[in-house]
Amino acid sequence: MSQTDLSRELYQSLWNAADILRGQMEANEYKSYLLGLIFYKYLSDNILQAVCDNLDETFESFQQAQLLYEENFADTDVREDLIEVLNDELGYVIEPSLTFTKLVQSIHEGTFQLESLAQSFRDIEQANEKFENLFEDIDLYAKKLGNTPQKQNKTISEVMKQLNDLNVSGHAGDILGDAYEYLIGQFASDSGKKAGEFYTPQAVSHLMTQIVFAGREHQKGMSVYDPTMGSGSLLLNAKRYSKEASTISYYGQELITSTFNLARMNMMLHGVAIENYHLSNHDTLDEDWPTTEPTDFDGVLMNPPYSLKWSADSGFLQDPRFSSYGVLAPKSKADFAFLLHGFYHLKHNGVMAIVLPHGVLFRGAAEQKIRQHLLEEGAIDTVIGLPANIFYNTSIPTTIIILKKNRTNKDVFFIDASKEFEKGKNQNNMTEDHIAKILETYQKRENIEKFAHLASFEEIVENDYNLNIPRYVDTFEEEPVVPLTDLADQLAEIDKEIGEVEARLAHMRSQLVGTTPEAQAELTAYLEKLKEI
């Protein structure tokens, strides 16, 4: 089976498991259950694979590996060494009685208890600080799973049985990670506006990541940072565009705990080593992070919540992230606060890509002062206008702003990619061809009529530091000149058609007859009234 067929089969199987929960709760709610159980199976299957490897036994099936694990765990001479090896290798241990395979076996035997699954979750969370509170969003006793303990048990049992046939550990790395991303994308589509908190469409992620990684594909030890990471999809795209993916260090921050947990699972399912990712569950603007080395990064990738309210407390004027600008982003729109936070954590030779609404390009007052400061120091390298309606949480057009610290000039390159899309059922989509066109234009940095323009700093000053894309890229299409004689002919033809329609309508009205004297009188009065109009 080809990798494409394998991925397609895996995607479909995972989505079928979601059908069991779909009728009982919103996608935004059931994603935690399904993704959490997939992750638990992944950890559990890895244990059984590792048991076979460390006991020099060929892995044949999870049932065979389960029996091997039970036998050796029961042997007191082997147990402690086996636990130590598993902890060293995987960073956690799941006892034989609590593996996914064992619990599914108990489901078929009619002895399964939700408490066994809850205990397994607790054991995993306590095994390693990176697993702490990982499953806290999964309430196994929630009423939405069923009104009685028996119904709750049955719902979870059905999902586990559906997932049981999947060899998720066999798909570890990008195949399983991509399947997980597929599910997250499907949840985002189902969730609508609620999805914006955790997902950036893949096309946008690919475009931003390729820009940040341009010329760095072979760099070892690359560090990437996303202070509003959501599910981590934007960060994880770094793996696709690096020839040294195993050496990348990932840093991310997320305020919403359920989304933070999603990102942690996503990292592991993509095969990222525990020591290579560093994630924080805090408020990015209120609590600067990281504050200990390393604090700056080769690449910064961001898709923050748009025009979010924040405190804008005057104390932030002393915060090193914002102090050199003399003003703060307005309380009603934190867009520039997020941008300055990311820029502060960018290395001198790094590249930053951030998605924001178009308002940041032209709004006045404090935002204009911040924008002017950034332009005067040459920080804004490129502005890319994206198509409208490509995000799940908003239909407004957005822009990617590329920032750098080591530029020797202050010009700004503008790309109007607002028409680079194909229409989808609910959203517009950017294809690989659209992305390739934008990337090629970005790299060449040359003027293209109605698509791209390299604006000098003097030109920007003349525009009062307003970066609104239409000021620099003229996409106006003139209407073709139509001779007046042609217009007269068209009007005459239209008048003729109107006359024909009115004649047909008058004929149809003349055929109307009332079924009673009263109805006939009313109809006659109606027709007389029409003649007066």
Predicted segment positions?
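A conserved structural/catalytic subdomain of Rossmann-like adenosyl-cofactor enzymes
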Residues: Q3-D5, E287, T292-I533
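Conserved S-adenosyl-L-methionine
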Residues: K194-M302, S307-F316, R321-Y325, F336-A337, ...
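A generic secondary-structure signal for well-formed alpha-helical elements
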Residues: K41-V51, F187, R216, S242, ...
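Surface-exposed acidic, glycine-flexible loop patches that form ligand/cofactor-binding
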Residues: V168, E217-H218, H345
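Non-catalytic, mostly N-terminal accessory regions of nucleic-acid modification and defense proteins
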Residues: M1-V212, H278-T284, G385-A388, K410-S418, ...
